[in-house]
Amino acid sequence: MVTIKQIAQEVGISSSTVSIVLGGKAAERKISTATQKKIFAAAARLGYQPNMAARSLRGGSGANELVVAMFWAQDFRASMMLRFWDGLRAEIEKTARPVRLVIYPYVNDHLKESEALTSGANCHAAIICNASYADLQFLEDTQLPIPVVLYNRVCNGYCSVNVDDLKMGALAARAFADQGCRTAAVLTSSPVFEGMENRMHGFRLEGEHHGLTILTNRYCENSIRGGYEAVSHRLRHEWKQQLPDAVFCGSSAIAHGALRAFCEAGYIGEKLPRLIAVGNGPEESDAFSVPSLSVVYLPMENMARECIQLVLGQLDGRITTPESRLLPIEYVPRESCGPLTEYAAQ
């Protein structure tokens, strides 16, 4: 195992300075950025990992155990965590070395306050989910002491796993056009990361390309209640005289609320607008709703598997430079909207 003393000898700096930097205390001790970069580069080159053997043994775990932190935002996305967690667990079960997952909830824009991430004293590596613009800026400006993988985000210097968000929106618009829709509304919450904006941008561009008129978007809460209240309000006002032919929802939760509101108002069967959601909720909930919900499916479980693979690859030295993986997405037609044509599906 590589020691702090060996790193100090490699770069010609005192062991105490190396310890401060690797412990995440460089800023408060006013250690220069150049010195920090030298230390982190040497640590990566030599294969240094935080020594948590004693901590693990005190907790009843073996010294060989890897501790991987999962940082997840404390907001509307908390309910989506289970699918991601299931993907992590499925991949970890295939590994020979024991891995312990630890969840660290955090508040968007305040990732920099997570000492477990900046100190490197509590985990060997981290997977960061739901990072905001401010959080990504913090990551870009900071040299962290442990390997980090980003879920559905891109940031210079970090490994990441993503999907094509523009295509997610485009697939929904194409499906509506193929079903003969001429007008479409959007139900989504305020964007908290670039991918949300890209989905709506892709939807608008593809829709306009196919002659689909996109109605003015008004944000709603990203929840079942939010979708229900948004549709109920519109049915009393701008949709009172004329419904849109189609509705694109930014999440499964919003869509389920929307379906409930339409049903209560008597819009069922052929009276119901075509409806597609970004499929980020439990697949069973989408498949067994009434009507069953058509989605552009977000492959969260597969993305989680790729995240843990990147973590383990960095820890064992197989991955030494930032690597980004782009996973495929698909449109899953169900009762709320029909399939793509053969041409559009290509």
PLM region descriptions:
Residues 62-174, 178, 235-239, 253, ...:
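Alpha-helical recognition/docking segments in bacterial nutrient-uptake
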Residues 73-83, 102-111, 161-171, 187-233, ...:
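Hinge/beta->alpha junction and helix N-cap segments in small-molecule ligand-binding domains
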Residues 43, 92, 207, 235, ...:
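Conserved hydrophobic residues forming the short capping helix/wall of the S-adenosyl-L-methionine
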Residues 66, 124, 182-183, 213, ...:
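Short acidic/polar active-site loop segments enriched in Thr and Asp
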Residues 236-346:
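Flexible loop/turn connectors
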Residues 15-20, 58-76, 183-190:
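Short beta-strand segments enriched in small/hydrophobic residues
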Residues 1-59:
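N-terminal helix-turn-helix DNA-binding module of bacterial transcription factors
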